[in-house]
Amino acid sequence: MCIRDRPKIADYPFTTLHPNLGVVHQDNKEFVIADIPGLIEGAHEGSGLGHRFLGHVERCKGLLHLIDVTSENIKRDYLTIIRELEAYDTSLSEKKQIIVLTKCDAVKDQKLNFAKEQLKKLNVKKVFGISSVSGENITKLVRQLQDLISSMNKIEDNQDGLEKVSSWSP
């Protein structure tokens, strides 16, 4: 995986202050990903530049939620985002989503499994655990994103009545 954009990364909350776009390259395919700053409670009312950030979310085909597994309350963190999306525009919560627990290298398996169970109780069907430090499950996640985008493109093409045309080269 290669993302050429190098947004600021640090070990404190809200490092991302502006949306960043990056192109992900994997398996001879590519897609654009938007890194949107974290939403806080009240974002739908404009708190923490919420309207501006949520406006960017509206233009995304799908959502990738990154939740810090070291958080004291994973359930609250997840529900805060979902509630803010719904309060801003109910169609946002209907977008396809992938839920990811980050910093999995920083916790024991017991904590990771507990976090996954908490999310499954909220009807989250699949939860990925990744580590940006070790690279654990990053490639697997990118391939899952590719599959999600591909399936969404097929649905859009079918709704538009478009036929899949194989590529042509002279």
Where are these regions (language model features)?
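C-terminal-of-GTPase-core extension/linker across diverse P-loop GTPases
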Residues: 15, 72, 76-79, 83-170
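Flexible beta-alpha connector loops of hexameric P-loop NTPases
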Residues: 6-9, 37-46, 68-75, 105
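Inter-motif core of Ras-like GTPase G domains
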Residues: 48-71, 87-92
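Short secondary-structure boundary/capping elements
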Residues: 16, 45-49, 111
